[in-house]
């Protein structure tokens, strides 16, 4: 399990989440016991480490090469960070490239992620996953 302490900042947690997105166990371990990932624009929500692990596993099944890159931090405090970051990866089921920019806010509490809320372009997601 990933070692975090109460001194771990929000930006450190966001970077660790991005660095570990290919490892669902490590990504989920960054969250508080009752931590939440929300993607309101696609009506997705996972609460608790097991649910978050499952969300990441499901994502990687659909987009095996999913990795965050080009993180631009806009607002940063010790317990909150707002950033934009991108993903560009193949969707094997459609043969299309999933090219997306996310806007995310992360709230840290006790050295863990309490909330990660992300927004994304739903039209781009629909295009990448459409089989036409």
Model-identified regions with their sequence ranges:
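Short, low-complexity N-terminal intrinsically disordered segments enriched in polar/charged residues
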Residues: 1-29, 33, 132
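A beta-strand edge to alpha-helix "cap/lid" segment located at domain peripheries
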Residues: 2-5, 60-132
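Residues at secondary-structure transition points
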Residues: 4-8, 46-50, 97
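Short, mixed-charge, low-aromatic patches
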Residues: 7-16, 39-45, 59-64, 82-86
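Hydrophobic alpha-helical core bundles mediating ligand binding, dimerization, or RNAP-core interactions
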Residues: 14, 18-21, 31, 56, ...
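Hydrophobic pocket/interface hotspot
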Residues: 17, 26-28, 35, 48, ...
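A solvent-exposed, acidic/Ser-Thr-rich amphipathic alpha-helical stretch
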Residues: 24, 28-77
């Amino acid at each position: 399990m990933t070692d975090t302490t109460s001194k771990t900042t929000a930006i450190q947690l966001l970077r660790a989440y991005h660095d570990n997105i290919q490892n669902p166990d490590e990504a989920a371990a960054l969250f508080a016991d009752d931590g939440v990932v929300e993607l309101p624009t696609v009506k997705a929500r996972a609460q608790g480490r097991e649910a978050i692990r499952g969300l990441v596993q499901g994502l990687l099944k659909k987009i095996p090469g999913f990795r965050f890159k080009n993180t631009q931090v806009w607002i940063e405090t010790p317990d909150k960070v707002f950033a934009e970051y991108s993903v560009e990866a193949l969707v094997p089921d459609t043969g299309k490239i999933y090219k997306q920019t996310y806007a995310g806010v992360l709230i840290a509490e006790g050295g863990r992620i309490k909330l990660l809320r992300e927004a994304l372009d739903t039209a781009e997601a629909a295009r990448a996953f459409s089989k036409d």
